[in-house]
Amino acid sequence: MWVCLQLPVFLASVTLFEVAASDTIAQAASTTTISDAVSKVKIQVNKAFLDSRTRLKTTLSSEAPTTQQLSEYFKHAKGQTRTAIRNGQVWEESFKRLRRDTTLTNVTDPSLDLTALSWEVGCGAPVPLVKCDENSPYRTITGDCNNRRSPALGAANRALARWLPAEYEDGLALPFGWTQRKTRNGFRVPLAREVSNKIVGYLDEEGVLDQNRSLLFMQWGQIVDHDLDFAPETELGSNEHSKTQCEEYCIQGDNCFPIMFPKNDPKLKTQGKCMPFFRAGFVCPTPPYQSLAREQINAVTSFLDASLVYGSEPSLASRLRNLSSPLGLMAVNQEAWDHGLAYLPFNNKKPSPCEFINTTARVPCFLAGDFRASEQILLATAHTLLLREHNRLARELKKLNPHWNGEKLYQEARKILGAFIQIITFRDYLPIVLGSEMQKWIPPYQGYNNSVDPRISNVFTFAFRFGHMEVPSTVSRLDENYQPWGPEAELPLHTLFFNTWRIIKDGGIDPLTRGLLAKKSKLMNQDKMVTSELRNKLFQPTHKIHGFDLAAINLQRCRDHGMPGYNSWRGFCGLSQPKTLKGLQTVLKNKILAKKLMDLYKTPDNIDIWIGGNAEPMVERGRVGPLLACLLGRQFQQIRDGDRFWWENPGVFTEKQRDSLQKFSFSRLICDNTHITKVPLHAFQANNYPHDFVDCSTVDKLDLSPWASREN
């Protein structure tokens, strides 16, 4: 467990938020001392990482993995991400050890040579992981080299950006709620599960659907989110605190921060005292070390670049391709086909948790550019559509340009698919999320600006979780007449987690895609926030295991990430900052909800950003309140304007290519990549069959003729 240094003299001499930027302020820790400390910590952390990987493989090889183990499969860091997180953990543990040891001999000046420490750990300054070719017309897989002045800006496996300084209990890494007697702004923070029970939960599913948004609207939000950010969990770095202690005995310590159940919680009878919770992976601090507060990693590129299709690391990108073909194709499933159309390939690295959902079918999880692709089957369906579209584009481009080799075809198809995702998001999705606030936060495009920081902010990873309020309790599968498909046409949401067999063995993606088009999202309601399917049964695909609470996880994660409170973000966005119950009632326009929040948090200053932002009434024609409109709008504007390869930036595509791209629609993508023949023109709006549906023959096709090379 973290032990907060309590020497008054130390606290008077150096704050935890600011450490001088000098390479060697003092010689309290010699190079030898640093080297010795780092060596010892590396042994400890490396063992923890190895033990964790071994344990995960062993438990998933059993016939009964726990909910935590299923979750861990997708939140488990891999590749370069794992290395970056391991270095971050070694740095932090070494810093704690050196600070503790050096203060014993030099209380008046305990500063460390942080540059030497970073070098010894293997951190160093952020540099591109690939060689930059400034003349390349294509993005790198890692996101490096986009900004020529700062090539690592927006790249994968770097820290999430901070728009406001982190707020931790100890100023460095401990989340609020870690120490029972510690307060925040004079008040103890409420249990995350208690907030979920009293504010987020509801029982009656009647009247919760959004009469103006399709289910695809919800699903596209998850696609965009997975393209932009992913913060895997870290490992326990101490021998004193095992994952078993965390999961089975709720013993808090190291990077275990269990979500405790309040009194009278029904889960106390079935799940013990808590839900296990492991803290997010973090990276080394970077020069000039103005802050040593823990900074969480973004394992994927910050750009809206279809990284969830192609990956954010070269090794994964290569694994996803069909390199035996000269057509620039992505690899597809060789064991199963969807009536002649391709599925995502299986991730055949054993073990696969998806196999345990139906032990008779034993269908593995899918392999995609994002490891979360099999988390739920609507997400897997969307991934499948994007994979098919890449291969369709590559084949069509080959017809136009027979002389193009596989690499050229792959890169051009990847470039076009990335543009599709950008266009659909900014033209079709964001305007009906931000509503009347769209033009305020995302004005018309003025071109690339290399001074704009495109990195995903830490707060955005919580703001964009508004989509959890849009998930309905059931998912429907529909036939070619948009009527219920089969005897199990409507499935409870919780049965669809990791459920790849429902796609492979039970109908393919067409019935699910029709459900996305013709069924509705859930409407965010101040009295009915998150369905019980997510609030009590998250990652509970079978009755044999207990589900998690996504709302409580979101709240605990806010604290894990050191998120400033509700009013800090209201101030950041230029909005009023309510200080009293009456003030909060005015902002929320809901006396009952305001009182519930004040009873729990005591002050609006302490309200966690996820619940505070989502509690606000929605802006006109939008699906978020003023605070989330600000945070989301600001982030998407920076993603667009700070991207040198943005589809509208002159030189990325020709004028004729841009004209062609603008005619693309998600409905056309479905027509081209499924057996579906009837689609709505506005796929994110709520649509009723047959009134709002048209034949695919009337939907504009993408004209690829502007991509014909002059060399033909």
Curated annotation (Swiss-Prot):
Record-listed E.C. numbers: 1.11.1.7
Main location: secreted
Alphabetical keyword list: Antibiotic, Antimicrobial, Calcium, Cytoplasm, Disulfide bond, Glycoprotein, Heme, Hydrogen peroxide, Iron, Metal-binding, Nitration, Oxidoreductase, Peroxidase, Phosphoprotein, Secreted, Signal
Residues where Phosphoserine is found: 315
GO cellular component term of the entry, any: extracellular space
Residues marked Transition state stabilizer (site): 372
Glycosylated residues in this chain: 106, 212, 322, 358, 449
Disulfide bonds: 123-284, 132-145, 246-256, 250-274, 354-365, 573-630, 671-696
Chain positions with 3'-nitrotyrosine modification: 482
Known catalytic reactions: 2 a phenolic donor + H2O2 = 2 a phenolic radical donor + 2 H2O; iodide + H2O2 = hypoiodite + H2O
Keyword match Disulfide bond: yes
Pfam families: An_peroxidase (PF03098)
InterPro entries assigned to the protein according to its UniProt record, in alphabetical order: Haem_peroxidase_animal, Haem_peroxidase_sf, Haem_peroxidase_sf_animal
One of the GO BP terms on file: response to oxidative stress
Gene3D superfamilies on file: Haem peroxidase domain superfamily, animal type (1.10.640.10)
Superkingdom in the source lineage: Eukaryota
Function: Heme-containing oxidoreductase which catalyzes the conversion of thiocyanate (SCN(-)) into antimicrobial agent hypothiocyanous acid (OSCN(-)) in the presence of hydrogen peroxide (H2O2). Also involved in the conversion of iodide (I(-)) into hypoiodite (IO(-)) in the presence of H2O2. Responsible for the inactivation of a wide range of micro-organisms and hence, important component of defense mechanism. Shows antibacterial properties against E.coli, K.pneumoniae, P.aeruginosa, S.sonnei, S.saphrophyticus, S.epidermidis and S.dysenteriae.
Cofactor(s) for this UniProt protein: Ca(2+); heme b
Chain's gene name: LPO
Annotated protein name in UniProt: Lactoperoxidase
Example of a GO MF term: calcium ion binding
